[in-house]
Structure formats: C-alpha cells, structure tokens
UniProtKB/Swiss-Prot annotation:
Organism in which the protein naturally occurs: Vibrio vulnificus (strain YJ016)
Listed Basic residues bias regions: 7-16
NCBIfam families named among the record's database cross-references: rpmF_bact
Superkingdom of the organism of origin: Bacteria
HAMAP family linked: Ribosomal_bL32 (MF_00340)
Keywords: Ribonucleoprotein, Ribosomal protein
Gene Ontology biological process terms, A to Z: translation
Region (Disordered): 1-28
Family matches, as Pfam families: Ribosomal_L32p
Similarity section: Belongs to the bacterial ribosomal protein bL32 family.
Record protein name field: Large ribosomal subunit protein bL32
Xref: InterPro entries: Ribosomal_bL32 (IPR002677), Ribosomal_bL32_bact (IPR044957), Ribosomal_zn-bd (IPR011332)
Length: 56
C-alpha cells in the first residue's frame, strides 16, 4: 500500500478542497403557474417559458 512521504500542510489541504464547495440550485418561478422549478427545465405542470409543452 502507498504511504505518504511527507505530511501535507493545512495550506495544501485547503487548496485541494477549494473546488469541493457545492453550489445552490438556480431556481426560477414560472410566469404562468407561479411554480418554482429548476432553470431550463419543464415545470411539474408541463410549462416551459410560459407555454404548455407537455399534456398530462
């Protein structure tokens, strides 16, 4: 098994972890139904950019 030669410093550990942060989801409110949904996605009611695109 591999064993490290030298201990990594707090600085190097922080530099490695700097890209691990999670981003919040970009949400939008539909103009027609007022429903909250993910950006660039159809709402649960089937609306996209104010128009009905899916019939349930």
């Amino acid at each position: 098994m591999a064993v490290q030669q030298n201990r990594k410093t707090r600085s190097k550990r922080g530099m490695r972890r700097s890209h691990d942060a999670l981003t919040t989801a970009a949400l939008s409110v539909d103009a027609t139904s007022g429903e909250t949904h993910l950006r660039h996605n159809v709402t649960a009611e089937g609306y996209y950019r104010g128009k009905k695109v899916i019939n349930k």
